[in-house]
């Protein structure tokens, strides 16, 4: 009974501190229109946002409009929110399209590969994704390789 009461008090206090639909994050711009909250395993795709952010505090608002609000008051419309996904260990044949430098989408899904510093162009090109563990791996594309630091799947927010 006491544990339940304490848990209820905790929930009430945190609800007051963070209004519904507002999620505090620390974000870094990883590519044009992409911001990562590495500590939360979240990747955010914005619409025409040019804020140069490195470990900047921001609020992800998941209300009707969907915005990423920076502490200086700058607001960016959010297109899609992605969360880290685990893939089965091993080799996967995939079809990829480069969205931005270091960001590749997998054909037929709402999944992105985050491969920073990878600039190989691709437009629905065949590739091999070699997952070394369930979270990271190597993308073999056009005879080159890129280190995949994360696989992210779109969520409704």
Explain the meaning of each model-derived region.
Residues 1-4:
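Positively charged n-region of N-terminal signal peptides that target proteins for export
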Residues 6-15:
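Bacterial N-terminal signal peptides
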Residues 9, 42-44, 103, 138, ...:
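Weak global preference for isoleucine
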Residues 18-26, 53-97, 123-157:
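Short, flexible, surface-exposed loop segments at domain boundaries
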Residues 20-62, 90-108, 112-113, 117-120:
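N-terminal secretory signal peptides
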């Amino acid at each position: 009974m006491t544990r339940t009461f304490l848990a209820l008090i905790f929930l009430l206090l945190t609800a007051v501190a963070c209004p519904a639909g507002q999620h505090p994050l620390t974000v870094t711009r990883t590519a044009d229109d992409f911001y990562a909250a590495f500590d939360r395993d979240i990747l955010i795709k914005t619409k025409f946002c040019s804020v140069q952010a490195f470990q900047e505090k921001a609020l992800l608002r998941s209300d009707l409009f969907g915005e990423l609000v920076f502490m200086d008051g700058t607001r960016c419309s959010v297109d899609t929110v992605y969360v880290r996904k685990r893939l089965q260990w091993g080799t996967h044949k995939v079809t990829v399209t480069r969205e931005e430098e270091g960001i590749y989408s997998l054909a037929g899904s709402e999944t992105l590969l985050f491969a920073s510093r990878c600039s190989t162009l691709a437009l629905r090109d065949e590739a091999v994704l070699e997952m070394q563990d369930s979270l990271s791996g190597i993308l073999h594309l056009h005879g080159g390789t890129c280190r995949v630091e994360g696989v992210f799947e779109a969520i409704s927010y």
